[in-house]
Amino acid sequence: MSVEVDGFNASPLFKELHEGLADKSKAEEAVKAVNAVIVITLKNKEGKEQSWVLDLKKAGTLAKVDGAAPKGDVQLILKDVDFVKLANNKVNGQKLFMNGKLKVKGNMMKATAIESVFKKLDPRPKL
């Protein structure tokens, strides 16, 4: 199942994350580290909203949501462009939150784990 959505700059990142979680050892490591279901809801420049569910509680999977976002342990709500910056370590999640660009619903501590997940599953070479 594809996790990419036309019109969202974050689509390639979700594809990389999905492929990274296909590695069972990486998925198990992420589940151990996070132990939460994270719902990520993004809004693109056209104002369209799309959600993805990152299940790091049991399955270690990522899925695109069709329709309303389900309830998870934590929900991150932000603009598509800000999520791309967050995933690429160009901006800190705390800074986005403090500036009102990131809304968090649910377990705030679990929300901080998302940055570590991207670092662990990043396929790009470490310099």
UniProtKB/Swiss-Prot annotation:
The keyword Cytoplasm does not apply. Gene3D superfamilies: SCP2 sterol-binding domain. The keyword Cytoplasm does not apply. Residues 43-52 are annotated as: Hydrophilic. Induction: By alkanes or fatty acids; repressed by glucose. Pathway: Lipid metabolism; fatty acid metabolism. This is Oleate-induced peroxisomal protein POX18. Its main location: other. It is found in: Peroxisome. Signal peptide: none annotated. Monomer. GO terms for cellular component: cytosol; peroxisome. GO terms for molecular function: lipid binding. Pfam families: SCP2. GO terms for biological process: fatty acid metabolic process. InterPro entries: SCP2_sterol-bd_dom, SCP2_sterol-bd_dom_sf. Residues 33-41 are annotated as: Hydrophobic. It comes from the Eukaryota. Is involved in beta-oxidation of long-chain fatty acids. Its exact function is unknown, but possesses a nonspecific lipid-transfer activity, despite the absence of a cysteine residue thought to be essential for the activity of its mammalian counterparts. Residues 14-119 form the SCP2 domain. It comes from Candida maltosa (Yeast). Keywords: Lipid-binding, Peroxisome.
